[in-house]
Amino acid sequence: MGKTNDWLDFDQLAEEKVRDALKPPSMYKVILVNDDYTPMEFVIDVLQKFFSYDVERATQLMLAVHYQGKAICGVFTAEVAETKVAMVNKYARENEHPLLCTLEKA
């Protein structure tokens, strides 16, 4: 009887590992935050360059940032979201703009 229980435990462990491996990754929202100094054209440029939006959609999102204080640029896995946030913030600083990009769990 001991062997049967060992196999059941092993099977249960294997099923749990497979279930854990198949879980979808955690997703994160990448958010642009409004400020009073970054030009609207620069925000549109950021949305096109880093999020691949066309000029029309980038303009809509820029206006959402401007009037609502922030807007979600996209939802990504943690690694992608962290990379996009870092790249946008670096690009903004290199161009001497205070634009802030953040992330939060979706």
From Swiss-Prot:
SUPFAM superfamilies: ClpS-like. NCBIfam families: PRK00033.1-3, PRK00033.1-5. It holds the Pfam family ClpS. Binds to the N-terminal domain of the chaperone ClpA. It comes from the Bacteria. GO terms for biological process: protein catabolic process; proteolysis; response to heat. It comes from Escherichia coli (strain K12). PANTHER family: ATP-DEPENDENT CLP PROTEASE ADAPTER PROTEIN CLPS, ATP-DEPENDENT CLP PROTEASE ADAPTER PROTEIN CLPS1, CHLOROPLASTIC. This is ATP-dependent Clp protease adapter protein ClpS. Belongs to the ClpS family. InterPro entries: ClpS, ClpS_core, Ribosomal_bL12_C/ClpS-like. GO terms for molecular function: molecular function inhibitor activity; protein-folding chaperone binding.
